[in-house]
């Protein structure tokens, strides 16, 4: 029986979408338990049944404008900080929030804490492989760090491997290193050193360097990057996809009658593309290297996204991903 | 009267598209002169008139698989190396190729040479602002370097400013620094230092940090980045746009009869988006910081792209961009 500590107040549509998504997940996964941290009255207005759900009243909320580390230190009775302490104290097995990303990362690092041997936990995101039905890849670190060292990129290769095995059920996942060219001799000082470290570990199915133009085509299952570049690439992909969809919509709307009819006939197809590109079914971003799953879903998450993210957390807990991490790093570092 | 040294053999459709594009530009710009380096016989098979065009016979070609620096050193009679020497020796004012990017960069750095005071020239690319008709922005460095220092990013801010003023006729162009957040306190060691250097120069219209998700929306005219991140972002944007267009096409093709009719009715609109996203009318990538314009058009360039790239080179020469660079850096460095 595993328990998830949920920041019920984080996110644009909180607590509504969080509570609805949690209830849906509760109905699907009878072995899961939930601790909902937040404004009890507001939560109860939405909650239909408190089966397997415990509500913990908190009085503060960390919002999107709060400076992360400061907020974690000062808002001691916030839904996020209280949820993080529940994990730290062993009352819950995972931390989940749709709120301020920086604050969640800070709570993960400073309250939940790092696995011994992992110097800089990294944020793992899941993105769609656009050319393959249902395909996906992970990008790690997608932004927990602004500066990384080669050894940390090597650790991301290992963390990403265990994640892909545990949660995505991929045997021997293909690990690629994000670089400015595919040839082994190409790269920055950082990627050249990281390349050698990863290549030297025969337990990793290393496919070598990958370029950002190819990752959406599924050239590997896990893309390892430093947090600065990973973040820039993630946001470039999201920005381009979002802008392209807007452009398509605007173009159809201003295309005259025939164009509008065309748009109408194509609507189901365009919705299919939109869904493929949308993040909701791929779950949340995971801070890998923390002592427990620390998971962030998008601020604009609806109940569906919350549900899928709980499913993802359940996969991590069911397959005991954290024990695999700690076993490995306690033995090897 | 300005002269452009053209590598007529570089690119997927060379010399055909190169010669056709040059002739079109020759007809448009009577003050320009061209030196076409390559296989004279092949060039003459395409050339309709040699007015203002001189052909220089060369016997070697650097292809896409050649290792750049090695190729520059060994293939002394290649069309690219001979064209670069023409610039170095003052016989031509600019270097243009659609061939191997690395080799062109190496020729720019090692043969044409750097402007005094500029330690690491950067590659400037032009991308479309998707939300604004005809809008565009520059990204610099988009991949000439794998590792950059803060002072170099500051130099890119200056080089980008002069470029936008000279070629794009933008008064007081808005310069942004690519970063992992817009707040001034965010960033890597590199971007934090670069931010301070750029912000301290009151001659620069610095709009602060920009994120890769916003640059396609035109938040600034010039995006300054280190070459590794700039390259990753450029390729992520190109990869996402390309994959999205493919996905749209595939979805229409498999959408059944109504969907296909819809696709047909929408075809003009979709072509409009494609054109907006396509690189051809935005010209080539420019190695800024070299002693003369060193310009690379896409390997798959058609005659139209070659024509637009010559127009872009003409703008740089007409507005004497290089003198502005050298005046500034000779005075200030």
Curated annotation (Swiss-Prot), chains A, B:
GO BP field: fatty acid biosynthetic process; phospholipid biosynthetic process
UniProt keyword list: Cytoplasm, Lipid biosynthesis, Lipid metabolism, Phospholipid biosynthesis, Phospholipid metabolism, Transferase
GO molecular function: phosphate:acyl-[acyl carrier protein] acyltransferase activity
Phylogenetic placement of the source organism: Bacteria, Bacillati, Bacillota, Bacilli, Lactobacillales
GO CC terms in record: cytoplasm
Role: Catalyzes the reversible formation of acyl-phosphate (acyl-PO(4)) from acyl-[acyl-carrier-protein] (acyl-ACP). This enzyme utilizes acyl-ACP as fatty acyl donor, but not acyl-CoA.
Similarity comment: family membership: Belongs to the PlsX family.
The organism's place on the tree of life at top rank: Bacteria
Name of the protein in question: Phosphate acyltransferase
Pathway assigned to this chain's UniProt record: Lipid metabolism; phospholipid metabolism
Gene: plsX
Subunit structure, as described in the record: Homodimer. Probably interacts with PlsY.
Enzyme class: transferase
Subcellular location: Cytoplasm
UniProt catalytic activity: a fatty acyl-[ACP] + phosphate = an acyl phosphate + holo-[ACP]
PANTHER family to which the protein is assigned, alphabetical: FATTY ACID/PHOSPHOLIPID SYNTHESIS PROTEIN PLSX, PHOSPHATE ACYLTRANSFERASE
EC number, UniProt record: 2.3.1.274
tRNA-binding among keywords: no
UniProt xrefs under InterPro entries: FA_synthesis, Phospholipid_synth_PlsX-like
Organism: Ligilactobacillus salivarius (strain UCC118)
């Amino acid at each position: 029986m595993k328990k998830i500590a949920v920041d019920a107040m984080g996110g644009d549509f909180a607590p509504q979408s969080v509570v609805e998504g949690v209830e849906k997940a509760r109905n699907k996964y009878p072995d899961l338990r939930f601790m909902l941290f937040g404004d009890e009255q507001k939560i109860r207005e939405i909650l239909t049944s408190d089966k397997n759900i415990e509500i913990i009243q908190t009085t503060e909320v960390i919002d999107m404008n709060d400076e992360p580390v400061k907020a974690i230190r000062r808002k001691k009775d916030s839904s996020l900080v209280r949820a993080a302490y529940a994990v730290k104290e062993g009352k819950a097995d995972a931390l989940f929030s749709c709120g301020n990303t920086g604050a969640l990362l800070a709570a993960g690092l400073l309250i939940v804490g790092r696995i011994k041997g992992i110097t800089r936990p990294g944020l793992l995101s899941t993105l769609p492989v656009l050319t393959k039905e249902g395909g996906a890849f992970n990008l790690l670190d997608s932004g927990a760090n602004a500066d990384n060292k080669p050894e940390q990129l090597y650790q991301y290769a290992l963390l990403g491997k265990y994640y892909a095995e545990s949660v995505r059920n991929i045997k021997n996942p293909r690990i690629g290193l994000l670089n400015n060219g595919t040839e082994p001799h190409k790269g920055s000082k950082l990627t050249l050193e990281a390349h050698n470290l990863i290549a030297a570990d025969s337990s990793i199915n290393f496919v070598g360097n990958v370029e950002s133009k190819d990752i959406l085509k599924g050239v590997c299952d896990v893309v390892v990057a430093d947090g600065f570049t990973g973040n820039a690439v993630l946001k470039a992909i999201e920005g381009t996809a979002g802008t392209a969809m807007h452009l398509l919509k605007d173009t159809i709307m201003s295309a005259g009658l025939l164009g509008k009819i065309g748009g109408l006939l194509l609507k189901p197809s365009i919705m299919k593309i939109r869904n493929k590109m949308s993040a909701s079914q791929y779950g949340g971003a995971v801070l890998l290297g923390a002592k427990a799953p620390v998971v962030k879903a998008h601020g604009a998450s609806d109940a569906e996204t919350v549900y899928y993210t709980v499913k993802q957390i359940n996969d991590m807990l069911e397959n005991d991903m954290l024990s695999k991490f700690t076993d490995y790093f306690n033995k090897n570092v």
